[in-house]
């Protein structure tokens, strides 16, 4: 079963330039989780990922991380996702609008599995 969480908004410090290190910018985080099918059968929250709680953990992790690169932000968010017991894999896209003049947005994608996480 795939579970998508689209458009998680995170206001955090992100960027390399000195002016970016002193202000909050908004990231969009999109998450695709592979989870067991059980919740589709039981219709019970206990059998799936509490995505409201997961979104808050992603926000907190990115605020604390103060990443310079969106690539790092994507990995931080993916690690949070794979720390969930019911998640077997995660694909996380982090998008930063206005990263450079003349560019609408830049995004980084991190794909990880619980197996990859356990081998670190």
Q: Model regions: which residues?
A:
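N-terminal, polar/charged subdomain of small-to-medium soluble alpha/beta proteins
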Residues: 1-120
């Amino acid at each position: 079963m795939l579970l998508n969480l689209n458009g998680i908004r995170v206001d955090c410090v992100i960027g390399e330039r000195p002016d970016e290190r002193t202000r909050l910018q908004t990231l969009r985080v999109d998450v695709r989780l592979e989870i067991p099918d059980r919740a589709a059968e039981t219709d019970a929250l206990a059998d799936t990922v509490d995505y409201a709680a997961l979104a808050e953990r992603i926000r907190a992790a990115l605020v604390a991380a103060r990443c310079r690169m969106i690539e790092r932000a994507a990995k931080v968010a993916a690690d949070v996702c794979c720390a969930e017991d019911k998640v077997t894999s995660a694909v996380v896209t982090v998008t930063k609008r206005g990263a450079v003049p003349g560019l609408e947005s830049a995004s980084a994608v991190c794909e990880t599995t619980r197996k990859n996480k356990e081998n670190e």
